[in-house]
Amino acid sequence: MIDWQRAMGGDGHRGNRSDGILEAMASAGTKNPEVRGAAETAAKLLALEARLRELEDVMVAYSGGVDSAFLAGTAHRVLGKRMLAVLADSASLARRDLEQATAFAQSLGMPLEIIATEELDRPEYARNDADRCFHCKDVLFSVLEELAGKRGIAHIAYGMNADDTRDYRPGQRAAAQHAVLAPLAEAGLTKLEIRALAKAAGYPVWDRPAAPCLSSRVEYGRTVTREVLEQVERGEESLRQLGFRELRVRHHGELARVEIARDELARALTMEMMDAISAALREAGFKYVTLDCAGFRSGSMNAVLPVEVLARKGA
């Protein structure tokens, strides 16, 4: 773990010594060839810190995933009490994710508020079309705008990274409409670089698998309800109890399509484990259970979307 206080040349806040960061990054190192090097990554970190200092205050839309956790942690280190992390709690947030996000914020002593959002009450969200994520973020950012006004905070930011700009992310449109900033993307930080920096900072979330909201497991066109989300959450938690780490339970009505990381598939294909998976998903309320031979793929539900929709990306 990096001693950020020593590396930053001071009390861990407001430091800007690039030599300390470069030394720390070099000592931590990374074996991933897709991360171009400690110096380039450290330069992006400096750009991120400079941007945060420029803002002077920021409210971070915080989910507990590696991107928003790293952004919130960096904002806390740079701005101290002039930042506030806000965690939106709703039926689409797994209880496991809520607990982990809260624990991480508490471990840093980071200012945190947990608010309730009711996106399921919005028909445009519940009908679950290709713009579901837009409506979710529209609700979230509207609530954050109101809260920021009450707290006297001028800026709102979220954890979009540089890779996200190349994917279908309708939430980006909501961010643009609400003038929500994306400091990680502005600094050019990719997911792999964020993981490397989070690891160097000693953040336990550095290798946490991506955990989008539970609604992302529901096939497009199927109404999202609390019962459906609870069913998905029960199913996924049961599979974690069986020892699987990176997985999705895709909800296709009476059928559960299980995606498991390819390096874990062999263990899933034993007769004993297939019986256990089937029993767990049936206990969660599914009548049919199928194992996707392609393994886990982030955003696999988007495969059914028309090309012209995917081409919009964040537009």
Each predicted region: which residue ranges?
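ATP-dependent adenylation/nucleotidyltransferase module used to activate substrates
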Residues: 24-200, 256, 275-286, 295, ...
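Mid-to-C-terminal catalytic subdomains of enzymes
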Residues: 185-239, 243-248, 253
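Auxiliary Fe-S-binding modules of radical SAM enzymes
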Residues: 230-315
